[in-house]
Amino acid sequence: MMKLSVSFLLLLMLLPFITGEENSDSDVLKSGAAVRQGRGRCRGFREDCSQHRDCCGDLCCNGNTCVITVIACPKW
């Protein structure tokens, strides 16, 4: 049971690197909290944004609003 728990925690820590999500070192240390360094909290669905990194998780900024998309956000 202990090995399973350790494996699960390791997977959670490595997931952002596997998915290609960009994080600074200090963001990774915040244990998955939805906080962006220097900009406060990330924006949720249908909240205002100016760029993709303003939005939480897999949400994309489209027309200054965080939305769910079928494909990944462009990296610009």
From Swiss-Prot:
Tissue spec. comment: Expressed by the venom duct.
Gene Ontology biological process terms in this record: defense response to bacterium
Origin superkingdom: Eukaryota
GO CC annotations, alphabetized: extracellular region
Sorted UniProt keywords: Antibiotic, Antimicrobial, Disulfide bond, Secreted, Signal
Signal peptide start-end: 1-20
InterPro entries: Conotoxin-I_CS
Subcellular location: Secreted
Spans traversing the lipid bilayer: none
Entry remark concerning the domains of this protein: The cysteine framework is XI (C-C-CC-CC-C-C).
Protein name: Conopeptide X11.1
Lineage of origin: Eukaryota, Metazoa, Spiralia, Lophotrochozoa, Mollusca
